[in-house]
């Protein structure tokens, strides 16, 4: 923490919260001039920071503490019955690791996902510039995991591979393949990949109890939440 204490951070002005409409949000960002090396990113992930594009951030709201960083310690994970069904349903998918890049196949999948799954969110309408700025970053730890069925692209899990685990940045998938539960499968695959790499945890971002889009994360057990500056197991 001594090294982190020397870093500069900047807070945004209060703005409407994307997840809880009745709340005002403030976000704390690492100084954009600070080089984002892998070890620094890993250290900040241990204290609840996330990456979006070229920025590392965490919530810093004055009157709300609903956003709580969550991670899955993979050593203790065992899929439940529903999760085993999802794994079986998608066992034939091929996963390919790629460097982040822009192409029309990726963008078409992203566009259809946003239009059909998140038309009520602040990422709608999608655009090529939005896709590139948000996800296509030339960073040494970032990769696209493609999920393909007989060559057809079904999903991409944008993932940061860190010394302490995998950080699940964003996953988008074919909205016409709802029966496959591809978002859940991507998390289950990332858990298995983290364990295969001998790493500690999958960092899932923020859990928000009263937000349907963000409270699904506690379906994965065991799970740890970053509360009062330490990771605690949710019981």
Swiss-Prot record:
The keyword Ribonucleoprotein does not apply. InterPro entries: Acyl_CoA_acyltransferase, Asp_Glu_LeuTrfase, N-end_Aminoacyl_Trfase, N-end_Aminoacyl_Trfase_C, N-end_Aminoacyl_Trfase_N. One of its GO terms (biological process) is ubiquitin-dependent protein catabolic process via the N-end rule pathway. Belongs to the R-transferase family. Bpt subfamily. One of its GO terms (molecular function) is leucyl-tRNA--protein transferase activity. Keywords: Acyltransferase, Cytoplasm, Transferase. GO terms for cellular component: cytoplasm. It is found in: Cytoplasm. Its EC number is 2.3.2.29. It comes from Pseudomonas paraeruginosa (strain DSM 24068 / PA7) (Pseudomonas aeruginosa (strain PA7)). HAMAP family: Bpt (MF_00689). This is Aspartate/glutamate leucyltransferase. Functions in the N-end rule pathway of protein degradation where it conjugates Leu from its aminoacyl-tRNA to the N-termini of proteins containing an N-terminal aspartate or glutamate. Its main location: cytoplasm. It catalyses: N-terminal L-glutamyl-[protein] + L-leucyl-tRNA(Leu) = N-terminal L-leucyl-L-glutamyl-[protein] + tRNA(Leu) + H(+); N-terminal L-aspartyl-[protein] + L-leucyl-tRNA(Leu) = N-terminal L-leucyl-L-aspartyl-[protein] + tRNA(Leu) + H(+). It holds the Pfam family ATE_C.
């Amino acid at each position: 923490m001594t090294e982190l204490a020397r870093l500069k951070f900047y807070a945004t002005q209060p703005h409407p919260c994307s997840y809880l409409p009745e709340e005002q949000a403030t976000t704390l960002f690492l100084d954009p001039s600070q080089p984002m090396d892998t070890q620094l990113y890993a250290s900040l992930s241990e204290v609840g920071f996330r990456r979006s594009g070229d920025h590392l951030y965490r919530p810093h709201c004055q009157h709300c503490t609903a956003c709580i960083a969550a991670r899955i310690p993979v050593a203790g994970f065992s899929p439940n019955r529903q999760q085993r069904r999802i794994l079986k349903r998608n066992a034939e998918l091929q996963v390919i690791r790629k460097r982040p890049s822009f192409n029309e196949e990726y963008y078409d999948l992203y566009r259809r996902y946003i239009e059909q799954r998140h038309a009520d969110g602040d990422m709608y309408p999608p655009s090529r510039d939005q896709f590139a700025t948000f996800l296509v970053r030339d960073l040494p730890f970032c990769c696209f995991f493609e999920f393909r069925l007989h060559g057809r692209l079904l999903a991409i899990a944008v993932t940061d591979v860190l010394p302490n685990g995998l950080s699940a940045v964003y996953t988008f998938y074919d909205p016409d393949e709802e029966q496959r539960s591809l978002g859940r499968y991507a998390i289950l695959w990332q858990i298995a990949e983290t364990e295969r790499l001998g790493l500690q945890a999958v960092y899932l971002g923020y859990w928000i109890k009263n937000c349907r889009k963000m409270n699904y994360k506690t379906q994965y057990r065991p799970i740890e939440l970053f509360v009062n500056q330490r990771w605690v197991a949710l019981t």
